[in-house]
Amino acid sequence: MESVERKSESSYLGMRNMQPEQRLSLDPPRLRSTPQDELHDLLCVGFGPASLAIAIALHDALDPRLNKSASNIHAQPKICFLERQKQFAWHSGMLVPGSKMQISFIKDLATLRDPRSSFTFLNYLHQKGRLIHFTNLSTFLPARLEFEDYMRWCAQQFSDVVAYGEEVVEVIPGKSDPSSSVVDFFTVRSRNVETGEISARRTRKVVIAIGGTAKMPSGLPQDPRIIHSSKYCTTLPALLKDKSKPYNIAVLGSGQSAAEIFHDLQKRYPNSRTTLIMRDSAMRPSDDSPFVNEIFNPERVDKFYSQSAAERQRSLLADKATNYSVVRLELIEEIYNDMYLQRVKNPDETQWQHRILPERKITRVEHHGPQSRMRIHLKSSKPESEGAANDVKETLEVDALMVATGYNRNAHERLLSKVQHLRPTGQDQWKPHRDYRVEMDPSKVSSEAGIWLQGCNERTHGLSDSLLSVLAVRGGEMVQSIFGEQLERAAVQGHQLRAML
């Protein structure tokens, strides 16, 4: 027994002493680049986590170790991803120091679909030489910085099929036979973000997965000092360069991002005055209790989709506390403790260095050039019917205003404006099926062509649609929906071959 233990220990030490670059790397990419002028099988607009999950699922479907029939797939899918950013990045503007993920690392881009995949978070740790060290953290919640690095590591495996720095501007229907009335491909036009050059690629199938765009309250002026939370870590340091200066900084919002920024500003600019402005009466904790968390289980999408529109809306409202305008309890407690210590020193809140102004809304912002501070006008967010006593009016003079008011998820409407006429008669908006393929008039569009939407289907697929929780499983569903017939043919061929042996 002792010799076995020593042998095991020796083997472990040998692996532990290997440098990360000596460890086994992933297999050669199973997705290969396609010449731009060729007709693609699939073109994905955007290469964030949603598209990355599709790439991983397709890679795994072509891996004979995971899919016995993969060796019968003779033609590699012709696929390309177009991404506006110059490299893979996930919420780079909100990689706040010390911030952690809000979901388990098991909900990575592969594990829930197939834990044997090479693209699991645990394999990432193994390849980086940190697996044993991570276990010592005793947590399921990695640092947000590390999880972004995990996704970047995954993305690097697909560099051959991603065109970075390409912003898609429109999708145009096309016909191989000009005399035909049926669309059988799409032309995706993109602009190079550096040169402005326009490129065009033809594809049978299109996935739109461009994520959200910054939502800014109406009435806020265009000013470089008014910054959306998505650009906090990338833009504010360049604007307020001297960390020792006594800046005045305001944050608008009551959700996780607003709370993280408000908390981080106090460390980043220790001599500054910070103010958190919110419509709500208080920060509210997110509900991540086990039973409630089951709404993010991948199989719950089926149940949600099968409901009527009215039932879906009721479900969204009932589950709002899991995701919208809520903050993790641990952070709320930290912020409250900081506020309390100020109260110990001075009971007059107006004199505090860091303040929270609940039940307020911004009515207007005066800005008279970069040399003078912006003036923010506030009033009560309560309905006027509740009395004039609540009509508090205040002004703040600030060097910067961080706006953490969420995201819009309707950018696909603009990209697909030239395809709208292909919707069924009387349909005034895109209607995704359960497999995320949008409904089109079959008399106008070939069954070989299609468009899929990702991350903008909350009203039909539930709260998890724009979140990481379902991406591993959904990536597999997308591959099945797009390439299912090809994969099934390969499976049949495999069964026939084995039957002959």
Swiss-Prot record:
- A single BP term in Gene Ontology: siderophore biosynthetic process
Instruction: Give the region (Disordered) as residue ranges.
Output: 1-31, 366-390
Report the catalytic activity: L-ornithine + NADPH + O2 = N(5)-hydroxy-L-ornithine + NADP(+) + H2O; L-ornithine + NADH + O2 = N(5)-hydroxy-L-ornithine + NAD(+) + H2O
Write out the biased-composition intervals (Basic and acidic residues): 381-390
Gene ablation phenotype (knockout): Moderately reduced growth rate during iron starvation and in iron replete conditions. Only displays 1% of wild-type conidiospore production in iron-depleted and replete conditions. Completely attenuates virulence in a mouse model of invasive pulmonary aspergillosis.
Assigned EC number: 1.14.13.196
Residues reported to bind FAD: E83, R84, Q85, K86, Q87, F88, A89, W90, H91, Q102, V168, S466, L467, L468
Q: Name one GO molecular function term.
A: N,N-dimethylaniline monooxygenase activity
Q: Which Pfam families match?
A: Lys_Orn_oxgnase
Enzyme class (EC, first level): oxidoreductase
> Which InterPro entries does this UniProt record tie to the protein?
FAD/NAD-bd_sf (IPR036188), Lys/Orn_oxygenase (IPR025700)
What does the cofactor field's note say?
Binds 1 FAD per subunit.
Residue numbers binding substrate? K107, N293, E294, I295, F296, N323, S469
Q: Could you tell me which pathway this protein works in?
A: Siderophore biosynthesis; ferrichrome biosynthesis
Function of the molecule: L-ornithine N(5)-monooxygenase; part of the siderophore biosynthetic pathway. Aspergillus fumigatus produces four types of siderophores, low-molecular-mass iron chelators, including excreted fusarinine C (FsC) and triacetylfusarinine C (TAFC) for iron uptake; and intacellular ferricrocin (FC) for hyphal and hydroxyferricrocin (HFC) for conidial iron distribution and storage. TAFC consists of three N(2)-acetyl-N(5)-anhydromevalonyl-N(5)-hydroxyornithine residues cyclically linked by ester bonds; FC is a cyclic hexapeptide with the structure Gly-Ser-Gly-(N(5)-acetyl-N(5)-hydroxyornithine)x3.
Per UniProt, subunit arrangement is:
Homotetramer.
- Tell me its family: Belongs to the lysine N(6)-hydroxylase/L-ornithine N(5)-oxygenase family.
Protein name in UniProt = L-ornithine N(5)-monooxygenase
Please tell me the species this chain comes from.
Aspergillus fumigatus (strain ATCC MYA-4609 / CBS 101355 / FGSC A1100 / Af293)
